Amino acid sequence: MKLAYWMYAGPAHIGTLRVASSFQNVHAIMHAPLGDDYFNVMRSMLERERDFTPVTASIVDRHVLARGSQEKVVENITRKDKEEKPDLILLTPTCTSSILQEDLQNFVDRASIESNSDVILADVNHYRVNELQAADRTLEQVVRYYIQKANKQGNLNLTKSKTPSANIIGIFTLGFHHQHDCREIRRLFQDLGIEINEIIPEGNSVNNLKNLPRAWFNFIPYREIGLMTAKYLEKEFQMPYIANIPMGIVDTATCIREIQKIVSTLQKPMDFESYIDKQTRFVSQAAWFSRSIDCQNLTGKKAIVFGDGTHAAYMTKILAREMGIRVACAGTYCKHDAHWFREEVQEYCDEVLITDDHTEVGNMIARIEPAAIFGTQMERHIGKRLDIPCGVISAPVHIQNFPLGYRPFLGYEGANQIADLVYNSFTLGMEDHLLEIFGGHDTKEVITKSLSTNSDLTWSADGLNELKKIPGFVRGKIKRNTEKFARENGINEITVEVMYAAKEALNT
């Protein structure tokens, strides 16, 4: 545990609650003190849904600490069973309530006797895993529970579908553009003649999990959540899975060829090459755009990419391979998947950063001074302070990245959206010059951009006037170099003379 005002991945119980609230008719009981129960508010604020968040907090208060939690937890489970009549009640502690070291499995066993619903304790170590790892583990636990239950009852559906079919595993509530990506994947599979067997967990019922073995293969759109479930199904039922994400023109084609290979081994050979060619050359605009003069203007520009493993890795490859943009640094906060990430990006970027500390990311951005950043909401904040444009490509995000319109990141339409995002994130070449030349009406003041919240430097009036004369595209860099020089030499006020002294010092 650590104290931080910004976390890229939340605590483990958030991942478990995301799984529970993604399924239909599943209720979560969160055994937690006040302060840990913000999930309901967060989901209600961010997700564009009309239903209530199915999470109840069983509050740990002074009475619980005096008498123990069993009575209260069991009462909450049985009460929700009678009120909501859910198919499953999922009990989870938080990292705070885990300190009490209570036997929650015993509470679950007792509540199961009095409840008509299935009751499960989330099998997650709250001190060792983060939100994404916990969600991955909880989904696998729920799937395993219902597969084993169906097997005992003799109603497990092991008969394969007549036509090629797939399960899509890993579409979640509060996911980054998950609903849009799901629609795009469904459309892609429909074009390829592949039936959708089940989509889990978003919008599905736990009672349908017994149908998972019907599918020919499993498709994992994001490796952060869903991979454990796919590996379990592969081990139990020899079901192949695809974890090659269709993000960008090149990797979408690779993913389709992988589907072709799996389907062809199970029935007569299929050929999707003509579909790939048609989509790449005539339907998708991204391939054409990458060869246009507009995109060529971006060639060689420096960018930084940071986010979850899936989005950061594939975004790095899109920028480097498809658009000719130099990725100065690619990074992820998924430290548990660092080996895979390095393997994916090391040949497409200058350096790799694996960290969950936002200050390290901020310092790296300030040091490299890229033309654009592609990251999370935090990198967007950093970019604003350093006057560097930022395109958001990964969770964690705020409300503006839960759009009402259709904005997928996967498939051929996703490639179009990414091309737009990339181009619009870079400052257009003549924009700053035109503002400088014709901007007599422009009242924008040049302000100090720094990652430090307590700047100890002031700019004199003549210093600011001199700074305004410098073209916008290099102004930020000169300003930071001047401030660095001033700090190193103990100067508190920056004048024109200090600016020239800093320039001379830099040139020597």
Curated annotation (Swiss-Prot):
<dbReference type="InterPro" id="IPR013580">
    <property type="entry name" value="LI-POR_suB-like_C"/>
</dbReference>
<keyword id="KW-0934">Plastid</keyword>
<keyword id="KW-0408">Iron</keyword>
<keyword id="KW-0479">Metal-binding</keyword>
<dbReference type="InterPro" id="IPR016209">
    <property type="entry name" value="Protochlorophyllide_Rdtase"/>
</dbReference>
<keyword id="KW-0004">4Fe-4S</keyword>
<comment type="pathway">
    <text>Porphyrin-containing compound metabolism; chlorophyll biosynthesis (light-independent).</text>
</comment>
<keyword id="KW-0547">Nucleotide-binding</keyword>
<dbReference type="InterPro" id="IPR005969">
    <property type="entry name" value="Protochl_reductB"/>
</dbReference>
<dbReference type="GO" id="GO:0005524">
    <property type="term" value="F:ATP binding"/>
</dbReference>
<keyword id="KW-0067">ATP-binding</keyword>
<feature type="active site" description="Proton donor">
    <location>
        <position position="294"/>
    </location>
</feature>
<comment type="similarity">
    <text>Belongs to the ChlB/BchB/BchZ family.</text>
</comment>
<comment type="function">
    <text>Component of the dark-operative protochlorophyllide reductase (DPOR) that uses Mg-ATP and reduced ferredoxin to reduce ring D of protochlorophyllide (Pchlide) to form chlorophyllide a (Chlide). This reaction is light-independent. The NB-protein (ChlN-ChlB) is the catalytic component of the complex.</text>
</comment>
<keyword id="KW-0602">Photosynthesis</keyword>
<feature type="binding site">
    <location>
        <position position="36"/>
    </location>
    <ligand>
        <name>[4Fe-4S] cluster</name>
    </ligand>
</feature>
<dbReference type="GO" id="GO:0051539">
    <property type="term" value="F:4 iron, 4 sulfur cluster binding"/>
</dbReference>
<dbReference type="GO" id="GO:0036068">
    <property type="term" value="P:light-independent chlorophyll biosynthetic process"/>
</dbReference>
<dbReference type="GO" id="GO:0016636">
    <property type="term" value="F:oxidoreductase activity, acting on the CH-CH group of donors, iron-sulfur protein as acceptor"/>
</dbReference>
<dbReference type="InterPro" id="IPR050152">
    <property type="entry name" value="ChlB/BchB/BchZ"/>
</dbReference>
<keyword id="KW-0411">Iron-sulfur</keyword>
<feature type="binding site">
    <location>
        <begin position="429"/>
        <end position="430"/>
    </location>
    <ligand>
        <name>substrate</name>
    </ligand>
</feature>
<dbReference type="GO" id="GO:0019685">
    <property type="term" value="P:photosynthesis, dark reaction"/>
</dbReference>
<keyword id="KW-0150">Chloroplast</keyword>
<keyword id="KW-0560">Oxidoreductase</keyword>
<dbReference type="Pfam" id="PF08369">
    <property type="entry name" value="PCP_red"/>
</dbReference>
<protein>
    <recommendedName>
        <fullName>Light-independent protochlorophyllide reductase subunit B</fullName>
        <ecNumber>1.3.7.7</ecNumber>
    </recommendedName>
</protein>
<dbReference type="InterPro" id="IPR000510">
    <property type="entry name" value="Nase/OxRdtase_comp1"/>
</dbReference>
<keyword id="KW-0149">Chlorophyll biosynthesis</keyword>
<comment type="subunit">
    <text>Protochlorophyllide reductase is composed of three subunits; ChlL, ChlN and ChlB. Forms a heterotetramer of two ChlB and two ChlN subunits.</text>
</comment>
<dbReference type="GO" id="GO:0016730">
    <property type="term" value="F:oxidoreductase activity, acting on iron-sulfur proteins as donors"/>
</dbReference>
<dbReference type="Pfam" id="PF00148">
    <property type="entry name" value="Oxidored_nitro"/>
</dbReference>
<dbReference type="InterPro" id="IPR042298">
    <property type="entry name" value="P-CP_red_C"/>
</dbReference>
<dbReference type="GO" id="GO:0009507">
    <property type="term" value="C:chloroplast"/>
</dbReference>
<dbReference type="GO" id="GO:0046872">
    <property type="term" value="F:metal ion binding"/>
</dbReference>
